[in-house]
Amino acid sequence: MDNLFSHSDDALPGPVDPVESLEPVICTVTVPGPVAQAFAGFTDHTHLWWPLDSQGVYGPGSYVEFEENLIVETADDGRTAVWGSIDDWQPPLSFHASWHPGTTAIWSTELRVAFRAVEAGTELRLFHNGWEGAEDPAATRAAYAVGWPTVLDRFVRFMGGAAQD
């Protein structure tokens, strides 16, 4: 008897796919003011605070906006890049989008941003996952783990809050 167990080795689970083991990037910040104001600041006035110099496709001088069911960056020469497609829009509480700035929808990840009232104003919780959709899942996740805090710090300051540590 080669095996003490009643099942064969073929029935054992295989190795875990490294992409499936990548954790979501979750960031939470608090801004002063009511939920509706925070939602509008994030979605209607993105062009005023988004750090396009470091977190954009075309860099300074471009313009980012939520346009119908898309998130779009427009360069000063008129070129456009679709950052994502919104598939769940629940103002002023949340939105969900496929997310692919600088690449195509084929390589998209998943982004959900939710807003809720807290004693100090509004809490924004960003949940970014779906790394298996990215061309290079581990590198994409690592870049967003660094990038989202920078982006959200700019949003907090735009909304009148103190810079996050």
Describe each region flagged by the PLM:
Residues D2-L4, Y63, D76-A120, N129-E132:
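Hydrophobic-ligand binding "helix-grip"
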Residues I26-C27, D44-W83, S94:
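Short beta-edge strand/loop motif at the mouth of beta-sheet-based domains
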Residues A38-F42, I71, I86, F95-A97, ...:
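Hydrophobic pocket/interface hotspot
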Residues M1-I26:
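Short acidic N-proximal helix/loop "leader" segments that mark the beginning
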